[in-house]
Each structure stands twice: as C-alpha cells, then as structure tokens.
C-alpha cells in the first residue's frame, strides 16, 4: 500500500519514464493499494491503467465525488467494490472482495484523516522532539495538540466505521491497509 502523493506528481526521469509506475510494476505484488493515486494532468489515469493492465492487474477504483478516489490493482479476481460510509470530504475507505482460490478475502484500502500539519508545524514538532526543554516547546506543543486533537476527533469515527464494516462482513480473511495518518509527520 502506498500514498503516492498524486503518483509522485507525474514526474518523469531523464529517460522520459515515470519512476513511480516502474516501481509499482517491478514490485510484482499481487495487490497494490494506492492513496492519493489520482494522476496529475500530465499523467492520465487511462495511461496508468493501461500500464497496470499490461502487467496483469485488474483495476478497481471508486470515485463517487464524496472523497478522493481509492485505487486497488489486483492480480486476484475482484468480486465487489464498496465505499465504507463515513463523514469526510477528502478521505475514504474502499472495501474490495477478492477471490483467492476458493476463498473470498476482504481487502480494505484506507486513507484516513491526516493531521494536516504544515511544513512549519512539522518543523515545530521536530524541534519539540529534539529539545523538549526549549523556550518554545510549551507554546508549540499546545498549538500542535490543538491541531492533532481535531484530526483525531475525525479519524476516530472513521476507524469505527471501518471496524463495523469488517465485523458485519463476517469474513475470516481480512486485509486492512492504507494511509492511516496516525503519525504527526505523515
């Protein structure tokens, strides 16, 4: 599972290739889950899908306008795809049932609420970790805790929704993955 930050913003290398696509295909993974996998304007989704299809992947995405699309590329047959309902304008969780031999595996690809820390916030966080006794540590800590608490209040119900979905599915074989955004520096 990868948060590709919009497929590495569609950057090409000196040979004119997209290293992110080369990396994904070279991984030879049976299942690839992407968060922030929307292709930028210079790298069309159709092109990405054609590369992944040539590499033997079934392509599933859910883009219903309720959140950023979630992507799953699987070499296993895909039986169904569903969005797990929870409140968010940018994040989402995608439930995909895959056929593995005679069994059905439930795969949940998550992109949960982030702390939305700015680069400046991340520097403050690193400074607090490096020198918790510094003069700014207390004020910086209060400011960061306020931001982090807000994101945690949103992420908690998202996690509950995923857990409820998994429990109600009754599946014994479950893979839960994705960008859980539970680290302040993520």
Where are these regions (language model features)?
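Acidic/histidine-rich helix-loop elements
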Residues: 1-17, 39-40, 116-151
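Active-site beta-strand/loop signature of hydrolases that rely on acidic residues for catalysis
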Residues: 2-4, 20-45, 107-110, 147-186
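Short amphipathic alpha-helical segments, especially helix-boundary/capping motifs
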Residues: 20-26, 69, 135-140
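Short, surface-exposed linear patches
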Residues: 21-28, 54-56, 94-96, 128-132, ...
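Structured beta-strand-rich core segments of catalytic domains in phosphoester-bond hydrolases
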Residues: 31, 35-126
